Amino acid sequence: MIWHVQNENFILDSTRIFMKAFHLLLFQGSFIFPECILIFGLILLLMIDLTSDQKDRPWFYFISSTSLVISITALLFRWREEPIISFSGNFQTNNFNEIFQFLILLCSTLCIPLSVEYIECTEMAITEFLLFVLTATLGGMFLCGANDLITIFVALECFSLCSYLLSGYTKRDLRSNEATMKYLLMGGASSSILVYGFSWLYGLSGGEIELQEIVNGLINTQMYNSPGISIALIFITVGLGFKLSLAPFHQWTPDVYEGSPTPVVAFLSVTSKVAALALATRILDIPFYFSSNEWHLLLEILAILSMILGNLLAITQTSMKRMLAYSSIGQIGYVIIGIIVGDSNDGYASMITYMLFYISMNLGTFACIVLFGLRTGTDNIRDYAGLYTKDPFLALSLALCLLSLGGLPPLAGFFGKLYLFWCGWQAGLYFLVSIGLLTSVLSIYYYLKIVKLLMTGRNQEITPYVRNYRRSPLRSNNSIELSMTVCVIASTILGISMNPILAIAQDTLF
């Protein structure tokens, strides 16, 4: 009898929770319409996978790409609307959050065609791969709009768990298994550190979880200048440092880049940084409003270490993916300048603009690496020698993307760095900008070293990998080359026509 009553109570409670969730989704679902499109795409993928055979594989790519494109369209139609806080304060919609969501969707849209041929050649399970990519994208989008500590943590873990699964997707590869283990352990540790910092904020603010309410709670409890806030700031900064691969919290990055499947690395190298930057800008600027000098100092130290260590260690690498891992550590050091400058002096605008350029440069480079790896089976920098003699298009594409990453004019990377450093200089960050300029020159050295290898014509330097390289046709239906071409064009011409991009970035509301 008691069991029967308890069972009835459980059913009633479950029904109430379901009805409340349905009511929220029905009346406030329009505020997360782009996210709902991705959820619908995920459900459709699962249904088709259960009811179809291997011949329907092209439909999986079509559904994934279409849901991402429709989600981008829905996001663009919502641009310039008034900021809205929905779902009982858990989710915020404004231009600032939406521009980060757009960047994440753009990364995913470019990464899917980049992965098609790789998945077919390596015989990886396609449905699960696309499900993890879309779910990670969904987690990143919710992270960009999350307005309270619990939603931030859940969205972050949704993104992180999919990232761990993707990094270990080639289960028979020992390096992939090693990369997954390191990524999982370091990622779990960093999440624990981040949540510990959140718990300090929760306690000091009198039990508040919404970002703006935390500020009000700190004022009411008179704890905004207490030592506890400094402890919370340190733990949250360390947690964010792991997520952003900032030195000295970067140890996992080179191994994960080297061991994971290359399309996965391409996806994680940009989406993880965009999502973490969206979180860092809000979590530091809102709850730690009264400790701005302290977190500015912490970020300056981390940015300097990242720029110096990242670029110095990149010079010594023999693996292309490890070199790009250390290069990405240096690149995120430059982006931190924009966060430190903040909303004044166009700091956030310069950060958003550079991240857009970085997406095209980085994904273009990885597209070239995926293509070269599939045709030769090597990742060693030395084995790229003489590629121009066999495949001029691939060699030129890789050279343009690398030179753009280095910041050579008139490529997009030059204009992005110029604007970023100029904003930092105007804000008085003279030492930080000087370090950025010096390390940028250093990065050009190892990028030019690779470009020189690509263009060499001396037979004694050309390895068997390039000698036996099969030449690609002038006109190709290769989806990797499609992504590569789009990224190369963007890396080349976006900087010249960056005024409209700047205007949109400056129009974001924080």
Curated annotation (Swiss-Prot):
Principal location listed in the UniProt entry: plastid
The keyword Isomerase is annotated on this UniProt entry: no
Catalytic activity, EC: 7.1.1.-
Localization annotation: Plastid, Chloroplast thylakoid membrane
InterPro entries cross-referenced by the UniProt entry: NADH-Q_OxRdtase_suN/2, ND/Mrp_TM, Ndh2_N
Similarity field: Belongs to the complex I subunit 2 family.
Protein name: NAD(P)H-quinone oxidoreductase subunit 2 A, chloroplastic
Source organism (scientific name): Oryza sativa subsp. indica (Rice)
The gene coding this protein: ndhB1
